[in-house]
């Protein structure tokens, strides 16, 4: 069976910004919002906005734009934010702790229910009211909590070892915040976040302002 084509990453990454604006329009009691308005707010070209929104399956109405409520539903469904997904944080260090406490995830249906670490000083304690378990408990806790996602925040030198444990435990999606490209079976999905890329863009924009 052929693999389903994944939409272009830039288009997908812009959808949350669109969703934020459309929800604001809903709060302002607007029934429709145009691609032009979205484009102006985000400093994009209207044709780009329309192209991005087509991947959600919604079509705008001439001279009116997009129905606000339907657009919210379409974007959330496309992103998978209309259904709750449970997640484990693997690595209870500074980054893992920060992500565990980010309340915005819950707005998008991501429920972080536990953290894991190999440091005995952290095991048995809590971070942001989440229990911290030892890595040797991962398989047992996967059966108990049934998470779909592992958020990987361990030090880079332990990334592959932790990824192996995640795969063995049966989790099929890894959000990788380490700077290591981990190796996993084809059946496991990996999304790598490169925080340095965002910093690089910030640096370039600052240089152009000088």
Curated annotation (Swiss-Prot):
Coiled coil: none annotated. It comes from the Bacteria. The keyword DNA-binding applies. GO terms for cellular component: cytoplasm. SMART domains: CoA_binding. Residues 17-56 bind DNA. Its main location: cytoplasm. GO terms for biological process: negative regulation of DNA-templated transcription; response to redox state. GO terms for molecular function: DNA binding; DNA-binding transcription factor activity. NAD(+) binds at residues 91-96. Pfam families: CoA_binding, Put_DNA-bind_N. Keywords: Cytoplasm, DNA-binding, NAD, Repressor, Transcription, Transcription regulation. It is found in: Cytoplasm. Modulates transcription in response to changes in cellular NADH/NAD(+) redox state. Homodimer. HAMAP family: Rex. Belongs to the transcriptional regulatory Rex family. This is Redox-sensing transcriptional repressor Rex. It comes from Treponema denticola (strain ATCC 35405 / DSM 14222 / CIP 103919 / JCM 8153 / KCTC 15104). The gene is rex.
């Amino acid at each position: 069976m052929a693999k389903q084509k994944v939409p272009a990453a830039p288009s997908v990454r812009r959808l949350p910004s669109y969703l934020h604006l459309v929800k604001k329009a809903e709060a302002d009691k607007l029934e429709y919002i145009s691609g032009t308005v979205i484009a102006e707010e985000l400093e994009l070209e209207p044709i780009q906005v329309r192209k991005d929104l087509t991947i959600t399956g919604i079509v705008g109405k001439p001279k009116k734009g997009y129905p606000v409520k339907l657009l919210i539903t379409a974007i959330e469904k496309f992103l998978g934010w209309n259904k709750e997904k449970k997640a484990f944080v693997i690595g209870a260090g500074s980054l893992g702790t920060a992500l565990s406490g980010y309340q915005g995830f819950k707005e998008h249906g991501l429920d972080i229910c536990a953290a894991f670490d190999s440091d005995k000083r952290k095991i048995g304690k809590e971070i942001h009211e989440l229990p911290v378990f030892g890595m040797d408990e991962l398989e047992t806790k996967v059966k108990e909590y049934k998470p779909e996602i592992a958020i990987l925040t361990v030090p880079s030198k332990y990334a592959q070892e932790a990824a192996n444990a995640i795969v063995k435990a049966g989790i099929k999606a890894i959000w990788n915040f380490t700077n290591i490209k981990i190796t996993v079976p084809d059946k496991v999905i990996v999304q790598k976040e490169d925080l340095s890329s965002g910093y690089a863009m910030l640096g370039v924009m600052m240089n152009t302002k000088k």
